[in-house]
Swiss-Prot record:
GO terms for biological process: phosphate ion transmembrane transport. This is Phosphate import ATP-binding protein PstB. Its EC number is 7.3.2.1. Residues 6-247 form the ABC transporter domain. ATP binds at residues 38-45. Keywords: ATP-binding, Cell inner membrane, Cell membrane, Membrane, Nucleotide-binding, Phosphate transport, Translocase, Transport. The complex is composed of two ATP-binding proteins (PstB), two transmembrane proteins (PstC and PstA) and a solute-binding protein (PstS). Coiled coil: none annotated. It is found in: Cell inner membrane. Belongs to the ABC transporter superfamily. Phosphate importer (TC 3.A.1.7) family. It comes from the Bacteria. The gene is pstB. Part of the ABC transporter complex PstSACB involved in phosphate import. Responsible for energy coupling to the transport system. It catalyses: phosphate(out) + ATP + H2O = ADP + 2 phosphate(in) + H(+). It comes from Bacteroides thetaiotaomicron (strain ATCC 29148 / DSM 2079 / JCM 5827 / CCUG 10774 / NCTC 10582 / VPI-5482 / E50).
């Protein structure tokens, strides 16, 4: 029996009066990769950001329903949002390194969380840069600015930065859309490696990418989750006509 990592129950979400997500229930298994696909404005990124409460930062939003991670309701009273975001890391569409050295970009989260043991920090920086398949490219220039890295290297640095505080879930919002094909391939290879240790949820407009990297795929349209199934089934034999129309390019 696969362990359920993320469990959402009848999730509805509003921006002001706009009903952005409508009755979404799904389960995401531990150490799997789930892709969210669908046209722009369908709600997939909004849903992703609920998993580490990023939408809390937007005024006049409202959530109904439950989102549980490891069995705990992450919107219950008393939940420490900082602790949640340590456990549920986020990688954004455009690489966003801090104006610091490569080393300090990765060490930042550890320092913010009160880690003062420099030997541990050095070890963790090396471990996560290796985990993000970046160590061999940067090990001799850790003191240089992160801005000196290529876009693809910066994105892998941001993945390492998210990994440094030992999350169990990684959220990726279009992580390769701003990258060239070679850098995109490296990020996709990395996702395959990371699922040994992490539960990964990725939003992508690139359906070929969803087909390559994910175990399951959810298709969103107009704020609803139309279909959620094994990726192979979604792309070869979907049950819903809307899913078929989207993956064959008839709309979107």
């Amino acid at each position: 029996m696969d362990t359920v990592k993320i469990d959402t129950r009848d999730v509805n979400f509003w921006y002001g009066d706009f009903h952005a997500l409508k009755g979404i229930s799904m389960q995401i298994e531990e150490k799997s990769v789930v892709a969210f696909i669908g046209p722009s404005g369908c709600g997939k990124s909004t849903f992703l950001r609920l998993f580490n409460r990023m939408n809390d930062l937007i005024p006049a939003t409202r959530l109904e329903g439950e989102i549980r991670i490891d069995g705990h309701n992450i919107y219950a009273k008393g939940v420490e949002v900082d602790e949640l975001r340590k456990n549920v890391g986020m990688v954004f569409q455009r690489p966003n390194p801090f104006p610091k050295s490569i080393f300090e970009n990765v060490a930042y989260g550890l320092r913010v969380n009160g880690v003062k043991d420099n030997a541990f920090i050095r070890q963790r920086v090396e471990e996560t840069l290796k985990g993000a398949a970046l160590w061999d490219e940067v090990k001799d220039k850790l003191k240089e600015s992160a801005y000196a890295l290529s876009g693809g290297q910066q994105q892998r640095l941001c993945i390492a930065r998210a990994m440094a505080v030992s999350p169990s879930v990684l959220l990726m919002d279009e992580p390769a859309s701003a990258l060239d094909p070679i850098s995109t391939a490296k990020v996709e290879e990395l996702i395959h490696e990371l699922k040994k240790d992490y539960t990964i949820v990725i939003v992508t407009h690139n359906m070929q990418q969803a087909a390559r990297v994910s175990d399951k795929t959810a298709f969103f349209y107009l704020g609803e989750m139309v279909e959620y199934d094994d990726t192979k089934k979604i792309f070869t034999n979907p049950e819903k006509e809307a899913t078929q129309n989207y993956i064959t390019g008839r709309f979107g």
